Regions:
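Serine-dependent carboxylesterase/thioesterase catalytic core
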Residues: 1-91, 164-174, 181-183
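C-terminal catalytic-base region of ester-bond hydrolases, centering on the histidine
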Residues: 69-184
């Protein structure tokens, strides 16, 4: 019995995984989970149009906590075309879904299906897509129980588009900052 092949990639690993799709036959990879992928949306879209890409299901995990890194990526890595944007803001392809892990509606939906992920506690983090409590358990469910997590259901129930860039950084703090607290 042949086991399904899945890919989990973080940051630039997503670009490597997507670049490999052109060399693979249809059906070679079942699910790809991209954790705050450092890749242009246009390049991801093109990779998902290859024979292997068309048969894979792509989960674009993002968070506005990664905004600074996406901004730097767009300034330091040559874009495929003028105005190209990093994939963290989402992109529309039939076999892909974007999940924003700093979106309360997304976290509520996932929790309702049994994947409880902690709310973000940082404004800037390139690693929260796998260090935040609950994320690794969710990815395990995506890969080991795909029937419980159909891509089409996620596409239909998750907010799209994701929040605008810098929305997390510019958000007012939910707790008073220590320097502004009254002392006795």
């Amino acid at each position: 019995m042949q086991r399904p092949i899945h890919i989990i990639a973080h940051s630039l690993g997503t670009a490597v995984a997507l670049d490999a799709m052109v060399h693979l036959p249809a059906g070679a990879v079942q699910r790809i989970i991209s954790l705050t992928g450092a890749c242009y949306a246009a390049e991801a879209r093109a990779a998902l149009q290859t024979p292997a890409g068309k048969t894979a299901q792509f989960f674009n995990i993002s968070s506005r906590e990664n905004d600074l890194f996406e901004f730097l990526f767009e300034r330091l890595v040559r874009p495929p075309s003028r105005g190209a944007r990093a994939m963290g803001r989402g992109f529309d392809v039939e076999n892909a879904v974007s999940l924003s892990l700093d979106c309360p509606e997304t976290l509520d939906f996932l929790a309702g299906k049994g994947a409880v992920i902690d709310a973000p506690d940082r404004r800037i983090s390139h690693w929260s897509s796998y260090t935040r409590p609950g994320t690794l358990g969710f990815y395990n469910q995506l890969l080991r129980r795909p029937a419980d997590w159909p891509l089409e259901q996620l596409r239909a129930n998750l907010p799209h588009p994701v929040a605008e860039r810098w929305s997390r950084i510019l958000e007012r703090p939910s707790v008073p900052l220590p320097s502004f607290q009254k002392t006795a």
